[in-house]
């Protein structure tokens, strides 16, 4: 009797709960902040221009959402929408990666260009989208940017460029690097014509883009906490054998050291650009 009592196994008393993860929540209805991890309604976040309600982190905007935020409704006309990259160096798997990003983003390349109006003032615009090849600069990006700059020069329009890039596109080699000089020459012609160029640096702006067209605006603006620099932090520290400040390569650090004119919160982006365009319009009358 006692032997049977001690050998008796206890019945487990628990309930099995079925995993219902995401079953009742439509895809895309919620977004998690990449910084503080707070989960928010995607629609409400979009209404706040993708700025986190909890930590104020500026989550990336798509190129078209950025243009929508700074332009009058229905005023944007896109240029060169169908232009796509070739594979000049026959780099393995390059075209496959391009096609994958095209399907993922709905873009042909990592920059959208065209003209728009802000409070009735016409301007040329280029917006880089870091979802596509991390916004890396290849031949198509250089060509599209040069074309819109040249259009602005010919039609005497101010030009606004939003940069977001990991640098030059390695799969295009020297062809990618030459876009640094090519875009700078177009901007020089625009400047010589007495026209305004506003460079708006967003997170991240690095490498060849930061060393060329992103840094030569008549007015250089940035979003808060944006990473802006040329080489990586670790590379610099190993080269100079020194420890860099914690806020090195942030927008605030560059503002403090005179490399930016202003750090602008995204909710103030439209108003700030409108005020600058109005000043330029008055001066050039």
Swiss-Prot record:
Q: Name one GO biological process term.
A: malonyl-CoA biosynthetic process
Cofactor names from the entry are: Zn(2+)
UniProt keyword annotations, A-Z = ATP-binding, Cytoplasm, Fatty acid biosynthesis, Fatty acid metabolism, Lipid biosynthesis, Lipid metabolism, Metal-binding, Nucleotide-binding, Transferase, Zinc, Zinc-finger
Q: Gene3D superfamilies recorded for this chain?
A: 2-enoyl-CoA Hydratase, Chain A, domain 1
Entry's Gene Ontology molecular function annotations: acetyl-CoA carboxylase activity; ATP binding; carboxyl- or carbamoyltransferase activity; zinc ion binding
Q: Where in the cell is it found?
A: Cytoplasm
Q: Which residue ranges does the record assign to the CoA carboxyltransferase N-terminal domain?
A: 29-285
**Cellular component annotations (GO), alphabetically ordered:** acetyl-CoA carboxylase complex
Give start-end positions of each zinc finger (C4-type): 33-55
Q: Does the keyword Metal-binding apply?
A: yes
Chief localisation class: cytoplasm
Residues at which Zn(2+) binds: 33, 36, 52, 55
As recorded in UniProt, its EC number(s) are 2.1.3.15
Report the pathway entry: Lipid metabolism; malonyl-CoA biosynthesis; malonyl-CoA from acetyl-CoA: step 1/1
By sequence similarity, the record places it as follows: Belongs to the AccD/PCCB family.
On assembly, the entry states: Acetyl-CoA carboxylase is a heterohexamer composed of biotin carboxyl carrier protein (AccB), biotin carboxylase (AccC) and two subunits each of ACCase subunit alpha (AccA) and ACCase subunit beta (AccD).
Q: Give the matching PANTHER family.
A: ACETYL-COENZYME A CARBOXYLASE CARBOXYL TRANSFERASE SUBUNIT BETA, CHLOROPLASTIC (PTHR42995:SF5)
Q: What is this protein called?
A: Acetyl-coenzyme A carboxylase carboxyl transferase subunit beta
Q: What organism, scientifically named, is this protein from?
A: Staphylococcus aureus (strain Newman)
């Amino acid at each position: 009797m006692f032997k049977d009592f001690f050998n008796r196994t206890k019945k487990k008393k628990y309930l099995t709960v079925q995993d219902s993860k995401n079953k009742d929540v439509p895809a895309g209805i919620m977004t998690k902040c990449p910084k503080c991890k707070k989960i928010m309604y995607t629609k409400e976040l979009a209404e706040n221009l993708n700025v986190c309600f909890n930590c104020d982190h500026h989550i990336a905007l798509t190129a078209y959402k950025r243009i929508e935020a700074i332009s009058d409704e229905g005023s944007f006309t896109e240029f060169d929408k169908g232009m796509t990259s070739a594979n000049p160096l026959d780099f393995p798997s390059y075209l496959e990666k391009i096609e994958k990003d095209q399907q993922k983003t709905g873009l042909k390349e990592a920059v959208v260009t065209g003209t728009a109006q802000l409070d009735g003032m016409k301007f040329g615009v280029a917006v880089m989208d870091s979802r596509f090849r991390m916004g890396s600069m290849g031949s198509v990006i250089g060509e599209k940017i040069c074309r819109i700059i040249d259009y602005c020069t010919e039609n005497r329009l101010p030009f606004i460029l939003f940069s977001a890039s990991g640098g030059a596109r390695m799969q295009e080699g020297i062809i990618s690097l030459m876009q640094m000089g090519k875009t700078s020459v177009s901007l020089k012609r625009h400047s010589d014509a007495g026209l305004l160029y506003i460079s708006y640096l967003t997170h991240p702006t690095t490498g060849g883009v930061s060393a060329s067209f992103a840094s030569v605006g008549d007015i250089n603006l940035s979003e808060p906490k944006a990473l802006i620099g040329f080489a990586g932090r670790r590379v610099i520290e190993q080269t100079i054998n020194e420890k860099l400040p914690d806020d090195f390569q942030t927008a605030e650090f560059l503002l403090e050291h005179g490399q930016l004119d202003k750090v602008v919160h995204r909710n103030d982006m439209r108003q700030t650009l409108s005020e600058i365009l109005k000043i330029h319009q008055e001066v050039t009358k």
